[in-house]
Regions:
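Mid-to-C-terminal catalytic subdomains of enzymes
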Residues: 1, 6-24, 63-161
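N-terminal glycine-rich phosphate-binding loop for ADP-containing cofactors
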Residues: 49-53, 146
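Extended, charge-rich helix/loop segments that form flexible
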Residues: 59
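Acidic, carboxylate-rich catalytic segments that either coordinate divalent cations
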Residues: 153-182
Length: 182
């Protein structure tokens, strides 16, 4: 049982819902690292974002999250579970809200405000705990990794200053290429 979908459905991705993004801002925060700094022949991700372009250089980030991020998040979990030969179930995977999220509340410091309200209705005498982000041990795991060595990567790429999650992305890409020996 996984609950990744609750962040998507109920507004727990407050860092991605923090503002009405321009195209460039959203691409930068979503991609987090520029492939041109690490790959010899990077492929532009621009066409993926272009499908969500709005007037005045804005992006329909809510639709992007619903279409792209949702698939990305669920398939990552589904793959891990299938490799471990375990059943995968996320009760929120197909859940859609009848009304749009109140972005002002989320931006005002109330991520998952609907869940909190339902909790308070069901358990009126209990205090609502603060949201605690899922711990990410990648900084520790990837601390000593020296970086990719395949020819597809720019060898002068210095990964020492990168956060663990970005090292992990490079590591996974290199492992993928090793598996299929492209």
């Amino acid at each position: 049982l996984v609950g990744e979908g609750s962040d998507i459905v109920f507004g727990g991705l407050d860092w991605l819902l923090a503002k009405d993004w321009t195209m460039e801002e959203f691409e930068k925060i979503y991609i987090s690292m520029d492939p041109e700094n690490f790959l010899r022949n990077p492929v532009s991700l621009q066409p993926i974002f272009e499908r969500y372009r709005l007037p005045n250089n804005r992006i329909d980030y809510l639709r992007f999250l619903d279409d792209i991020f949702r698939i990305e998040a669920y398939t990552a979990y589904e793959n891990a579970f299938s490799v471990a030969e375990m059943p995968y179930f996320d009760p929120f995977e197909r859940l859609k809200m009848a009304t749009p999220l109140d972005l002002n509340r989320i931006r005002g410091g109330e991520p998952k405000y609907i869940v909190r309200e339902l909790f308070k209705m069901r358990y009126p005498n209990c205090s609502i705990p603060c949201k605690i982000r899922m711990p990410n041990p990648l900084d520790c795991y990837m601390r000593d990794w020296k970086g990719p060595s395949r020819r597809e990567f720019i060898l002068k790429s210095d990964v020492r200053g990168l956060k663990g999650k970005w090292k992990w992305q490079l590591y996974c890409l290199e492992r993928f290429l090793n598996l299929y020996d492209f």
